[in-house]
UniProtKB/Swiss-Prot annotation:
Binding site for (6S)-5-methyl-5,6,7,8-tetrahydrofolate: D120, Q183
Assigned protein family: Belongs to the methylenetetrahydrofolate reductase family.
Reactions catalysed, as given in the entry: (6S)-5-methyl-5,6,7,8-tetrahydrofolate + NAD(+) = (6R)-5,10-methylene-5,6,7,8-tetrahydrofolate + NADH + H(+)
Keyword terms of this UniProt record: Amino-acid biosynthesis, FAD, Flavoprotein, Methionine biosynthesis, NAD, Oxidoreductase
Entry keyword annotation includes RNA-binding: no
Cofactor: FAD
Any one Pfam family match given in the protein's UniProt record, by short name: MTHFR
Name this protein carries in UniProt: 5,10-methylenetetrahydrofolate reductase
A biological process term (GO) from this entry: tetrahydrofolate interconversion
Biological source species: Buchnera aphidicola subsp. Acyrthosiphon pisum (strain APS)
Signal peptide: none
PANTHER family, alphabetized: METHYLENETETRAHYDROFOLATE REDUCTASE (PTHR45754), METHYLENETETRAHYDROFOLATE REDUCTASE (NADPH) (PTHR45754:SF3)
Amino acid sequence: MKNYSQYHQDIMNQKLENIRNNIQCSFEFFPPKNSFLEENLWSTVNRLSLLKPKFFSVTYGANTGEREKTYDTVQKIYKKTGIITAAHLTCIDSTPHKLKEIAYNYWNSGIKSIVALRGDTLEKDYRHTMYAVDLVLLLKKIADFDISVAAYPELHPESKNVKSDILNLKKKVDAGASRAITQFFFNIESYLRFRDNCIKNKINIDIIPGILPVCNFQKLKRFSSMTNVKIPKWMLDMFNGLDDDIFTQKIIGSSIAIDMVKKLSCEGVKNFHFYTLNQSDITYSICHILGL
């Protein structure tokens, strides 16, 4: 008689082994605003460094103080861990001259990776507004930066349609982008359709899914409404009645992220970018369960 218990265990082990051998992860942080948050960031960096990620990235604020914090944080993480650390850089609130200065400083200090973004629109009316494609072109003229750009499986909030979104991404790729990191999402079919559209339009770079482990569902709903990210009904049902139970929310959030990585891995996805929110516990748990 067939030992089904052993049979199912072997299947599970094989699936985890396939994931362990075929995928890599990267992690996003944001610059800390005070000493308490800085201590928390370093605790997170130190713990996630143990997973030997492909790279880290550090977000970029829209004012001068935040910019300097990004630069300092990128430098410190890279020097302390030796792991490639990509600096986010936005162009909507800057000038070509200032961007060149920032880029030269990064390159000359050993930071060769940039996440090139337009940045969120601001109330102030900036003339000569630059776009992400302009920033990619500017960076490539300065040095051979390894450049990541943004992609939107569920449409950029300001885009007219899918076609314009794909065209914009293609322009960034043709300008020299090496990969695209997506906005977070929860509908796997949205990502797969987007990837298919990219292939049809000869966009041949890696489209890395951005994974956001849910820690606080109420905050997620508010943020999703601003970013055009759709929350599926099954997910609303899962978190129903848990507004005051953050612990259970984290467990469910971990389960959703693990399931997403497994399913996307079966579809040939090999790289995943985690939005950590500077918290290591849930992200580390997810990666540990996946055997990373």
